[in-house]
């Protein structure tokens, strides 16, 4: 039983650390949402070549965005509007909805990191002290953190859909969107992998709590 408990401790430590690193990397990078305008720019370039001579070159419009800022290909990154200042500015209802959603996921995802830190500390103590209730509490903590991560990611996806619809409504030439590639980036993929790993960590801690409980019952029976 000691061997099994040690294996569970190693698996929990590995998956927990992986989840923390991946989520921290996802939060800190700017490839959650990618807008690729290369096809549109090539089409515009062909039209300019067929027209009067014009040596001016249009700046690329492609961009990639994170939770905090958006970055253009040949320009510096610009921060997104602070969602916690919405009471001080006059915005439309749809824009206020976007700000509320933005403020929600920028709180939830870092909160999941904090939960994992506390879970890591209680998890270390629970294996060190072989405490059944502490193992159980740690498992519940990681499962709660996984749900927080899932909620944050889901709200971000919904936020992106609402922002896209808002942009379509404001765009006069909607046919141009057919030549623009819009997709989620690898930062979001890191967030999903972190969620799965965090969920697995919680399950491993619950399994360790059950294994320790069975071991203690067997020892008492002897």
Swiss-Prot record:
Glycans are attached at residues 54, 88. Changing residue 54 to K: Complete loss of glycosylation. InterPro entries: PMP22/EMP/MP20/Claudin (IPR004031), TMEM114/TMEM235 (IPR039951). It comes from the Eukaryota. It is found in: Cell junction, Tight junction; Lateral cell membrane; Apical cell membrane. Pfam families: Claudin_2 (PF13903). It is a multi-pass membrane protein. Keywords: Cell junction, Cell membrane, Glycoprotein, Membrane, Tight junction, Transmembrane, Transmembrane helix. One of its GO terms (cellular component) is apicolateral plasma membrane. Changing residue 88 to K: Complete loss of glycosylation. The keyword Cell membrane applies. The chain crosses the membrane at residues 7-27, 105-125, 133-153, 188-208. Its main location: other. PANTHER family: TRANSMEMBRANE PROTEIN 114, TRANSMEMBRANE PROTEIN 114/235 FAMILY MEMBER. This is Transmembrane protein 114.
């Amino acid at each position: 039983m000691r061997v099994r408990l040690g294996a569970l401790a190693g698996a929990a430590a590995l998956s927990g650390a992986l989840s923390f690193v991946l989520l921290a990397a996802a939060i800190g990078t700017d490839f959650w949402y990618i807008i690729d305008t290369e096809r549109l720019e090539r089409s515009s370039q062909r039209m300019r070549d067929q027209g009067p001579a014009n040596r001016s070159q249009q700046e690329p419009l492609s961009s990639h965005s994170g939770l905090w800022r958006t970055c253009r290909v040949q320009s510096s990154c610009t921060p997104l509007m602070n969602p916690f200042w919405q009471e001080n500015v006059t915005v439309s209802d749809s824009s206020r909805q976007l700000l509320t959603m933005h403020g929600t996921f920028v709180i939830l995802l870092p909160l999941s990191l904090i939960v994992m830190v506390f879970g890591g500390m209680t998890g270390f103590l629970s294996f060190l002290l072989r405490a059944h209730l502490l193992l159980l509490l740690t498992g519940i903590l990681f499962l709660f953190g996984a749900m927080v991560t899932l909620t944050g990611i889901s709200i971000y996806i919904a936020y992106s859909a609402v922002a896209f619809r808002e942009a379509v409504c404001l765009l006069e030439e909607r046919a141009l969107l057919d030549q623009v590639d819009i997709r989620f980036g690898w930062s979001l993929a890191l967030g999903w992998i972190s969620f799965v790993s965090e969920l697995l960590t919680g399950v491993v801690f619950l399994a360790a709590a059950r294994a320790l409980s069975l071991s203690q019952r067997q020892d008492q029976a002897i």
